[in-house]
Amino acid sequence: MNKWLCCALLVFLDIIEWTTQETFPPKYLHYDPETGRQLLCDKCAPGTYLKQHCTVRRKTLCVPCPDYSYTDSWHTSDECVYCSPVCKELQTVKQECNRTHNRVCECEEGRYLELEFCLKHRSCPPGLGVLQAGTPERNTVCKRCPDGFFSGETSSKAPCRKHTNCSSLGLLLIQKGNATHDNVCSGNREATQNCGIDVTLCEEAFFRFAVPTKIIPNWLSVLVDSLPGTKVNAESVERIKRRHSSQEQTFQLLKLWKHQNRDQEMVKKIIQDIDLCESSVQRHIGHANLTTEQLRILMESLPGKKISPDEIERTRKTCKPSEQLLKLLSLWRIKNGDQDTLKGLMYALKHLKAYHFPKTVTHSLRKTIRFLHSFTMYRLYQKLFLEMIGNQVQSVKISCL
């Protein structure tokens, strides 16, 4: 009898468990002292707690959890659970406490949780690249660079990069790369020295300075007639007028005039006079030896069309470290229809805060922008512009960037 009784009890419990699991809302058994019966009551939903059990006349009474407490599942508890206190050191809030969820903390950017501590992500040394980037839950996974790939930096984010294909760049391979160094290519020394920058930051600032605060009628024609050397033809002027706004036309005209008159003594003299500005820009940002990853982040932060990883890699191979950033900014300006580079940089600086970008670099970029907007440079631009056009356009009020 005892054996049959045990089997019957097990079957009964299985039925009760199946019933409470399959029905919705989930149920629980409650003994009702008023009737002496076992009742199937509704459980309380997440975000609430049990106030009163059900009876034969009414359903279970559940009420919302008070502030700073929660329940995250269907339950029969008569109280809510208090939320965890504030996050620990080096942690940030991933999800705030609410009635259905506890406060969730995670390690801040660049760290992962190991036991109870937020440790820095592993940095892969030269010769090893990142196979799996670190997350708030796990450390960085490094892997040795295979044949044909390299990593020349210590980084917690940079993967192994493919060796440069010198022939695709029109260059010769003079030293084969390995796991820690890229292929070394040979090329045109003069092209490498000036890095193919069509308009430098200082020249761009100077050309944009020449835009009057109020465009006078036929301003572009007056400027064309006033510029020395080979004149920009009427067809080119009309094309500039069709494609660009009135504020952008002066910059486009001066850029074309410089290209057509690069061998003119006047242009050479202006470029020499701008050397003071260029030296200062190099002093501010020329020392910023940015990694490929940092250049990628900076280019991603600029508005508009983006510079591709291949273009960044090609620039790193064909430009000196001190000119790489300037070359990429020049490429960005061209790709975005000659957008104002300084305005693009100011936009990027607002967004770099989220990337923990080196403060020394952002500080240098801000100093460069302030320098190119300074009164000293305003006076230099004014002097150069008057030298360039002589005294033929005296009525034009010139504005600094």
Swiss-Prot record:
Disulfide bonds join 41-54, 44-62, 65-80, 83-97, 87-105, 107-118, 124-142, 145-160, 166-185. TNFR-Cys repeats lie at residues 24-62, 65-105, 107-142, 145-185. Coiled coil: none annotated. Homodimer. Interacts with TNFSF10 and TNFSF11. Acts as a decoy receptor for TNFSF11/RANKL and thereby neutralizes its function in osteoclastogenesis. Inhibits the activation of osteoclasts and promotes osteoclast apoptosis in vitro. Bone homeostasis seems to depend on the local ratio between TNFSF11 and TNFRSF11B. May also play a role in preventing arterial calcification. May act as decoy receptor for TNFSF10/TRAIL and protect against apoptosis. TNFSF10/TRAIL binding blocks the inhibition of osteoclastogenesis. One of its GO terms (molecular function) is heparan sulfate binding. Keywords: Apoptosis, Cytokine, Disulfide bond, Glycoprotein, Repeat, Secreted, Signal. It holds the Pfam family Death_TNFRSF11B. Its main location: secreted. One of its GO terms (biological process) is negative regulation of odontogenesis of dentin-containing tooth. Residues 1-21 form the signal peptide. The keyword Secreted applies. The record marks 400 as: Involved in dimerization. Residues 198-269, 270-365 form the Death domain. Glycans are attached at residues 98, 165, 178, 289. SUPFAM superfamilies: DEATH domain (SSF47986), TNF receptor-like (SSF57586). Induction: Up-regulated by osteopontin. This is Tumor necrosis factor receptor superfamily member 11B. GO terms for cellular component: extracellular matrix; extracellular space; receptor complex. It comes from the Eukaryota. InterPro entries: DEATH-like_dom_sf (IPR011029), Death_dom (IPR000488), TNFR/NGFR_Cys_rich_reg (IPR001368), TNFR_11 (IPR022323), TNFR_11B (IPR017371), TNFRSF_decoy_receptor (IPR052459). It is found in: Secreted.
